Structures are given as structure tokens and as C-alpha cells.
Amino acid sequence: KENGISDCNCDRYFSQPDCDIGWDSSRDCFYHGYDLYMLIDSQSDLPVFPHYSCASTHDSHGFLQAFFRMRSFLPDYKVSKVLLDSAHDAMPYYQYFKRQNITPFIDLNSKAGRPPVYKNDFTIDKDGVPVCPAGHRMRRDGIEAAKGRMKFKCPKISHAGGCISCTCDNPCSNAKYGRTVHLVLNDNPRLFNNPPRSSKEWKQEYNARTSVERSNK
């Protein structure tokens, strides 16, 4: 190009032939090189296993390469929880972690979709909380571990003055405590988590994912 030749067919020497092109979403540009996937211990903020791959490797694939290589190099290292961003929000991840008795804390990818209807007339909100036919987010009412399901109840039930009453303008049930729905975890392990994404427990645990940024610094 320095000599005005834009289409040069001269032989070239590539010192790093396995480099390729990747997309940096934070900088909104392409780059040439490698991608570093670092597995971090969220309690100590210390790196556990670094793994380099081609720049074109998607984060979801980078995790698989790093995770299974880590397990081969560190077979005694115990993993009980994983904290991952929405790039890893795919059903096979949840199914694998369940088989391995690992609790996943994975942010939902809004582009991955949700079932339009659950149990005939409920919809599922963006964080996995059921929404009643009247459009109200249901209130969590515990988990039945033996049955593998979470219980959500009507949020419009009032106990004011020691009396139980429904404050909804269009109640969808005549039951004393209003409408109840059970989310069966096996129905959709991606959407239905224990603890659920709407809970303080989930958010507190997921906040520890910032250990990645602290480790990189």
C-alpha cells in the first residue's frame, strides 16, 4: 500500500495464524486477535483458570472450553454455583448444571423468548415471575422442594384489620386466598429457578459476578 499497490499478492508470514476477527460489543467494533475467558472464584476475587481462544469465539462457547479444560486440569476443584451473563442463557446450560448439582445464576437474554402462556391463562414476566390474567405480578409464597415446584399467590389479597379480602377489581378466583399457581421447575429450568430471579437471594448472589471486573483490574 505504501507504493500505491492495494491488491498485493506477495507471500506473507503470519506469526499467529490462529488469530481471527471478533466483535467487541462494548466498543462497537471488530478486532483481530484472541479472546480471553477467565473463570473467577467469586468469594476471593482470584482467577481460577484463564483460557485463550480465537477472537470469533462466542462467550457461550468460550465458557465451555474454559470450564471443561479447568475440570481436566483441576479435578478436585469443587463448583457449587455459576454466575454467568445473558450470553450463556441457553437451555443446555441449565440441564447440564442440574445433572451436576450446580446452581446456575444466569441473567435472562430478552431475545431468547418466553412461552406466551403458562397453565392456560398465565404469562411469564421477564424475570420468570408469573403474571395473572388481570396483569398483576404474582407474589412468591415459598417452594415445595419435594414436589420440585415454586408457589406464587395472588398479590391483591389483603389481611388488613385481620380480615382476608381480595382488592382486585376483576378477581380471577373465588378462593379465600385468591388465585395460586405452581411453577414446576422441570417445565422450564431456564425460566424457573430456585431461588427465582425476582428474589433478594438471587440478586445478592448474582451481584458477586462483579468479581470478574475486579480480577481483571
What are these regions (language model features)?
Residues K1-R99, F105-N109:
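Polybasic low-complexity intrinsically disordered regions
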Residues D11-D35, P171, V184-P189, N193, ...:
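Alpha-helix-centered segments that form part of catalytic cores
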Residues G22, K153-N194:
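Long, low-complexity, polar/charged, intrinsically disordered or flexibly structured peripheral segments
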Residues C54-H58, K81-L84, H88, T123-K126, ...:
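A short glycine-/small-residue-rich loop at the edge of a beta-strand within enzyme catalytic domains
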Residues R71-F73, V117-Y118, V129, K156:
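Short, intrinsically disordered/low-complexity patches at protein termini
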Residues I106, G128-C132, G161-T167:
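Contiguous terminal or domain-adjacent regions
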Residues K111-P116:
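Short gly/pro/ser/thr-enriched loop/turn and capping motifs at secondary-structure boundaries
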Residues Y118-M150, L185, P189-K217:
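Short amphipathic alpha-helical "interface-anchor" segments enriched in bulky aromatics
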